[in-house]
């Protein structure tokens, strides 16, 4: 989180590896919804079916402790703020499966539920509210 690179365009999003070069990018904001709708309708006509949900297993406490140690190290080295540390700790909790034991099967929905819980918790903090407001008004991340 503290070192995250934020994309400022669809092309840059592809360059950062978040999208495939074959993914569609519509730079015109006013055309995005219509273009997305047309892509979806085309996929339906071509017989698209969603892939099967992946099989996932919780990573558990040991990897989470490693993530938390790295997060603490970044804060101590001055690369992350207290709030960055709070967010990153919540992310570590999510991606390791919460309180589940290592190897326990976990679904995408379980991970989404953990993410929703963490996001709602963070939205109750003044610093998260400041970050959201700053991003909405400037388009740039706030490091507070």
Please tell me what each predicted stretch does.
Residues 3-5, 9, 15, 21-144:
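Intrinsically disordered, low-complexity segments enriched in small/flexible residues
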